[in-house]
Amino acid sequence: MGLQKIVKKYNKKMKRKGLAGLDTAIILIAFIITASVLAYVAINMGLFVTQKAKSTINKGEETASTALTLSGSVLYAVNYPSNTRSYWIYFTVSPSSGVSSVELSPTTTAISFTASTEGVAYSNIYKYTLLTVDPSSLGHAVYANGQYLNLINQQTSAGQTYVYYPNPYYALLALNYTLYNYYLSTKTPSPIFINSSTLSSIPQWLKNDNSFTFTLNISGQLVTYDVFVNQTFAFTYPVAGDPLIGSAIAPAGSVIGVMILFGPDLGSHVFQYQTVTIQITPNVGSPLTISEYIYQPEGSVSVIG
């Protein structure tokens, strides 16, 4: 009997220890599960925050990045050496790296010009584009030196046909012809008039315009054109890499010419020892801002940037 009591007492003691061990194990498992859940939540929260931050950064980059980039020199024309009149500013832009295309229609894109020192600020001066003009409509636009001038060139490469204007003056002639036909049909005055023969006397309707000349070598003969501008405006045209004939969209790899023509008001200012700012705001991305400090015009056409 004594042995049986001892055995029972021993078994009872061991049973209690077993239960105590089981309780401890359950509590430990509970802690492990809780810790795992908290770790899972923390990791997922961390991933969520990381993804959210990444999304915010990407969105910020998308907003901050410009869809267009300056792709050439900035030129400025004046009546050198008198330096009493300004005529135009010209430069080229291209879609930025990683941008597939940019729409450059005057209805979706704005161009502004500012010269704070002179108290000059013009907004939304972008009025016309030659990107939408069919090259076939310009075949008989300008007659000079016994022939029709080929204003626009076409080049085919890898099955694509690219159109471009050889220089800004050819684009000016094309713009003049296009606007003349448009305004002739609508009975409203064109903002630009170009004449290839010297006028014996300037008509009354041109006397207040800002005027300048340019000369082209056409089949060995120099032909001088008189340009009259009655309002400040900007226009664009294809310079290279534009296969989208008839569309205002500038695809990746293309080069687009931008020309700001000064009317009589802005033409009376000559910019020197000051900064001029041009801003292009397309329908995507942030504006392209071009700020150039002009020391002093060094010729009829000066490189200012």
From Swiss-Prot:
UniProt keyword Glycoprotein present: yes
Organism: Saccharolobus shibatae (strain ATCC 51178 / DSM 5389 / JCM 8931 / NBRC 15437 / B12)
Function noted in UniProt: Flagellin is the subunit protein which polymerizes to form the filaments of archaeal flagella.
PANTHER family: FLAGELLIN B1
InterPro entries on file: Flagellin/pilin_N_arc (IPR013373), Flagellin_arc (IPR002774)
Superkingdom as given in the UniProt entry: Archaea
Principal location: other
Disulfide-bonded cysteines: none
Compartments reported by the entry: Archaeal flagellum
Name the UniProt record assigns to this protein: Flagellin FlaB2
GO biological process: archaeal or bacterial-type flagellum-dependent cell motility
Residue ranges the record assigns to the propeptide: 1-18
